[in-house]
């Protein structure tokens, strides 16, 4: 009992308000100094949760590039069914960003193993439970590769528009990779020209699905973080591993929009399509991540399917509910 009270004292109120708490996870320092990750949690109602179909399940969510966790509706979806919901703000993102750091920078996606391991240690303090991994965009790539390196650690993997292939496609990636690797050796922190014109953020604002979180404006800039050769080399290495084929070792659900709009100039179609990733390329790449993969294409969904307009968002939740309750966790 005393140990439980000490652990609870490490959690403090989160910016998302009532029902959400956060805990700082100390990690090994890197060349830029001290490094932390941040775990956010929402627990099920103590009375209703004990009878939910997902009691005994922990969910770990990992966000995308230039992002942080703020999707309260998604958290409630899981806790309403009895699961404990956790979200990880990775090192140098969101709640975990510290002054003097390069936002979102990493030189190897494998380095995130430390962030995930720290989160899982905290989640398992109350004893082992079934684990569902939930990743969006870059977080989907990170969790796919993590699951492949940690067979049988997860009971299920849910991917929301995972960044499994470069927007230029396989041949474009293969042509670009040696140039990026060379640049990464010479100047890993050099800044690339800006390519994010803010259209994806504009689409969410027009849909009214992007909430205002006080004090979090810098965590998700309108045009995204600056990108760097060292970081892009890490992403391309991850894409190459997916292209070669991996085995995540658990049932996997991939949710994607039915269409994409290249973000070259603003179009109203961006409010009903993915304007970040070529979803057809992602669907093809999804067939190479495991032996039991379900791919769901959602008409009118945007890049984060859970931030789409009401109808496709409801469809995404229905698909997820049916999949998770239909035997994925057996």
Protein language model features and the residues they cover:
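N-terminal cap/lid segment of alpha/beta-hydrolase-fold proteins
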Residues: 1-52
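Active-site glycine-rich loops that stabilize anionic/oxyanionic intermediates
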Residues: 56, 63-68
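Conserved alpha/beta-hydrolase "nucleophile elbow" surrounding the catalytic nucleophile
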Residues: 63, 131-140
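Catalytic nucleophile-loop/oxyanion-hole region of alpha/beta-hydrolase
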Residues: 66, 94-130, 312-316
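Conserved alpha/beta-hydrolase
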Residues: 67-70, 75, 79-99
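Alpha/beta-hydrolase-fold enzymes
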Residues: 136-138, 142-227
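Serine-hydrolase catalytic core
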Residues: 192-293, 297
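Catalytic active-site module of serine/aspartate enzymes centered on a nucleophile-bearing elbow/loop
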Residues: 292-330
